[in-house]
Amino acid sequence: VLRPWHLAPILSLRTPALAVFASLALAACSGGPSGMPGFDTGSPGAGQGQPASTGQTIGNGKVKVGLILPLTAEGQGAVVGNSLRNAAEMALAEFPGADLTLLVKDDRGTPEGAQAGTQEALREGAELIIGPLFAPSVQAAAQVARSANRPVMAFSSDSNVATRGVYLLSFPPENDVNRVIGYASAQGKKSFAALVPDTAYGKVVEAAFQQAVADRGARTVAIERFSGDANSMRAAVGRLAPSLPQADALFVPAAADTMPALGLALQQGGFDPTKVKPLGTGVWNDGAVARVPAIQGGWFASPDTAGFNAFAGRYQQRFNSAPTRTATLAYDAVSLAAALARTQGSQRFSEAVLTNASGFAGADGVFRFRPDGQNERGLAVLELRNGQIVTVNAAPRDLGPKTQ
C-alpha cells in the first residue's frame, strides 16, 4: 500500500529532491544508561569476540545498504535492536517502490561484531551502513567503512564518535540543551544555575549548558552535581541554595528515576519554581517527571511527539507490540536512504547530499547532518503544567542557516 506521508512533505522543503517524510511515534524505552533515548556510553558486553551473524535481507532492490544492529545483545540492547530492525522493515514496506535491499547483520552489541558485520555487508555490496547503536560499535564499524569509502549513519548519541563520513542519526542531548537555553534567553532569562546528575549524561549536558549560556551572553551563577541517593541530593540543593536568588532559571536535567526525589529535596530546600524557572531536557518527557511539584511551569526541549505517535500506532498494528523510543531512528534512516536512492542517482550517499543544508523531514521532525557527523534537530519547547506536558513553542519546520 502506498502511503501519502512519503509524498506531501517532499514538495514542501526548499530542496524538494532531498526531503523525505517519515511519520513516527513515542514508546517507553531508552537506549542507554542515562535514560536519554539513544544516549550510550558503552556496549552490553554480550558475545565478546564472536563474529556477526550472517543475518538476512529485507527488500530486493538494486541499492544495497548494511543494517548493523545488536539483535542478540544482552538486556535492553537486544530489545532496542529488534525494535530498530522492525522499524527498518516497516519503512521499506511503506516507502513507495523502494529500490533497496537491507543486509541485516547482528553485531551482538560488541565492537568485534560490528566490525565483522560491516566487513560482511561491504563484501556483499553495501553502499551505506545504517547502525550500529552503541558508541564502541560505531567506532569499530566506522573504521571498516572509512577504508572502503562508504558512509555510516549510526544511532549513537555520543557525539565523540561522530566524524566526517560517520553521521549520527540520534537524539543528542546537546540539541535539547541548546534549544531550551535559547528559548529561556529569548524570554528574558539572563542568569542560570544548574543542578546536574553526576553521570556520563550529566557531564555532556553540563558542558552543553555552559556553552549555550555563554553563546547567549548570559551568566552562569552556580553549578552543583548530585548522585542518586537522597542525602547527596539534599546536600547539592543546600550548596546551591545561596546562589538561587541571583538566578532567573535552574537547569535540572534529571530523569524519571531521580527527579521525584530531587524535586522533594528542592521543595524542602525552599526552591520556588514561580520565582526561578525550572529547565530540563528530553528526559523530562515522562509522566512521572511531569507530576513533580517542584518543577511545575518548567520548560524542556524534545522532538514533537505527534509524528512518533502516528508511527507507534502503525508499528503496533504491524508487529502487535509497542516500539522503543529509538525505533523512529531506523525508520527515518531507511526512508531517507530509499528517497536518496530514488532521487540522487550515483551521488545518492555522497557527503554533499547527506549534509544538504535544508535537511530532511523525518518522524521526529526536521533534522540535518553537519559535516562533522553530528546532527541538528528541530525541537519543540514543552512546559510542565498541572502535571501535564503542553507545547509552548512548536518545533521549527526549517532549521535556518547551518551552525557549522
What feature does the model see in each segment?
Residues 25-28:
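C-terminal motif of bacterial Sec signal peptides marking the signal peptidase cleavage site
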Residues 30-33:
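Bacterial signal peptide processing site
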Residues 82-83, 94-160:
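Beta-alpha junction/loop-to-helix N-cap segments that form part of ligand/metal-binding clefts
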Residues 121-133, 153-155, 191-196, 244-259, ...:
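Periplasmic-binding protein-like
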Residues 151-153, 160-182, 196, 223, ...:
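Short beta-strand elements at the ligand-binding edges of bilobed clamshell
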Residues 168-225:
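An alpha-beta-alpha
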Residues 247, 259-331, 344-345, 395, ...:
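Extracellular/periplasmic periplasmic-binding protein-like sensory domains
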Residues 319-393, 403-404:
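Segments of small-molecule ligand-sensing domains
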